[in-house]
Amino acid sequence: MVKASPLGSIYTGTVHPGRYVIVVSGDTASVEVAVDTGSSVAGDTLVDLVFLPDVHPLVVDAIISEADLADCRGDALGVVETVTIAAVIDAADAGVKAAAVDVPAVRLADGLGGKGYALFSGDLAEVEAAVDAAVSRGERTDTELRHVIIAQLHDEIRDNLARELRLNYRLARRPGER
């Protein structure tokens, strides 16, 4: 992939369950050539891919940053879960482009059995629109997807989500630690 086209960045690594993931960024033409080359080489071992020429910056931030529900606007929370990393990135991008929502987290594969999930927060109508767009994108690409909308997120749950999303990390800390 990197020999076929100049890329802005490339991240690779293994994730559960025994998959190898490649994430690339750069100008649209270069990424398209790299993705075509990579998918051609991968052949039938390729599990999934997504090519987003104009991925929303909130999706990128949600992938690379710690989750932060503490400052999210609105009372509603939407959760979209997919069976692949590519599908959740695609769903998150569709959702945030369709509605005025925050994207506090997009989590990929590790500790999730290879699945991914995205969180949308905001006013109920906006979260519903974001989740609907994410679900529609999944249906168009024949992606297995689950979703739920919590209309009024309780403050205790918001506080828990603002600290750490992985339960094993939360349980390993002593009471009173964030």
Task: Label each residue range with its predicted role.
Residues 26, 119-120:
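Short low-complexity, flexible loop/linker segments enriched in glycine and/or proline
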Residues 2-18, 32-115, 121-178:
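Long, contiguous binding/interaction regions
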Residues 23-29:
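Glycine-rich loop at the start of a catalytic domain that most often binds anionic cofactors/ligands
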